Amino acid sequence: LALSTPIWVSCNDWTESEAKDYFEGPSEEYYAALRAYKKSDHPKAFGWFGNWTGEGASLVNSMAGIPDSVDVVSIWGNWSNITEAQKKDLQFCQQVKGTRFTMCFIITSVGTQITPQHIYDNWESMGFASQQEAVNDFWGWPSDESNKEAVEASIRKYASAIADTINKYGYDGFDIDYEPNYG
């Protein structure tokens, strides 16, 4: 009994459990040097990133988990209609790490990936014979492709919409993925 008494009366400060965070992230000096490096003349590191959610206990689906040495990241999928978590993740990496981000998709024709959904959903009620006819009409793509002025105007409208999308989401550019053997 005499030997067990110290167990019950000593070490009172150890009986209360509390979470302790011992992680100290990189310093502002580190990030300033990283941003300066990324602005310098050096071989650029580029990569693609998919399955982006910008949230979770693991950084596997966050831009913040990309190695600091990567200069430019092309977002493959999940680049549109981004969540608040994705916005914060993107802004952190752009502003703090100095990483640049591009949206990326395969271009099979004018309008790919950014034609408004209501065109796809309502083409029949809009009086078109096919979905593609409705898409072509929206972008001004002529049925007679020898009409160079109309083709150029359609391409310019599409390019302008891509630029607007880049600005809308705060990306740094667009990775044109044209694969002639696709589709």
Question: What feature does the model see in each segment?
Answer:
Residues 1-40:
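Bacterial Sec-dependent N-terminal signal peptides
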Residues 41-183:
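Chitinase-like catalytic core of GlcNAc-active glycosidases
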